């Protein structure tokens, strides 16, 4: 196959950051995607409707001229989030709220320390039709980092799903066979996003032959058996799994340091890399559902009407991109050859 035409895809999980970084990240995503679920872990975090609306305005201002890209805003849940916050956010057009266990990812220190305390908020979200997006890891210091996702499912996610069967839940950026099995066995109100890095890589790609900081993300890459479970899941074409890049930019100096930041900046190549994975799996016929249909259907939003075309054409991802502030950023898969290209 030399060409694939798809309904224009959406990215159901990414990080734009803020301020002048938006001048890089927003055009990178708008190049391919019609809509994106924008994570709220700024400093300070996006904890209410007013902050979400202001952030949306900053994103819209960074769109390329003529772009129809639409940011879909989210709320950052904290222990002080109230039912009124949820109602106001829904009224302002916020589509989802994000649950971060405290310390689980970049800028999550303000996040939730006692999940059961938020049950009244979850009940209101179900009532309002607002989705719950979950970074599914426990963060206690004694827990092995490779076991965080499995234990979160066992200790918290089962309880949330059983307690609130009408609440739509997305387990974000899943990394384990445990997550695949849980989502597959759960009701139609439970789904998951999967990143390109977790389909393409496993922990050997992070640690063998030297530490590779630009492959470091959270949740951390797992062993090959978990990677294969993710690949098998997307190859089935199940509507429970859909595209969420978790594209997360950090300046080169923040990644290449004694305590490097987590995140892979994949916006410039994500769809092409997903296509490469689906081709390897002999499942290119399943790519459109994963990239363009399943997420919109789960969110209860209309599918996009425009199309994009990928052509079989080799190109090399740049070694570095210069940010608006002049600092370099290393994109995901920098310097590597990709077999599919987005047709202009």
Curated annotation (Swiss-Prot):
PROSITE patterns: DIHYDROOROTASE_1, DIHYDROOROTASE_2
Residues that, per the record, bind substrate: 15-17, 41, 135, 218, 250, 262
Positions of post-translational N6-carboxylysine modification: 98
Cofactor: Zn(2+)
Source superkingdom: Bacteria
EC top class named in words: hydrolase
Residues that, per the record, bind Zn(2+) 2: 98, 135, 173
A Gene Ontology molecular function term of the record: dihydroorotase activity
Binding positions (Zn(2+) 1): 13, 15, 98, 246
UniProt keyword terms in alphabetical order: Hydrolase, Metal-binding, Pyrimidine biosynthesis, Zinc
Catalyzed chemical reaction(s): (S)-dihydroorotate + H2O = N-carbamoyl-L-aspartate + H(+)
Cofactor binding notes: Binds 2 Zn(2+) ions per subunit.
Listed GO CC annotations: cytoplasm
The EC number(s) this enzyme carries: 3.5.2.3
Keyword Zinc: yes
Family matches, as CDD domains: DHOase
Pathway: Pyrimidine metabolism; UMP biosynthesis via de novo pathway; (S)-dihydroorotate from bicarbonate: step 3/3
BP GO terms, sorted: 'de novo' pyrimidine nucleobase biosynthetic process; 'de novo' UMP biosynthetic process
Subunit structure: Homodimer.
Matches recorded under NCBIfam families: pyrC_dimer (TIGR00856)
Function (record text): Catalyzes the reversible cyclization of carbamoyl aspartate to dihydroorotate.
Protein name in the entry: Dihydroorotase
Encoding gene per record: pyrC
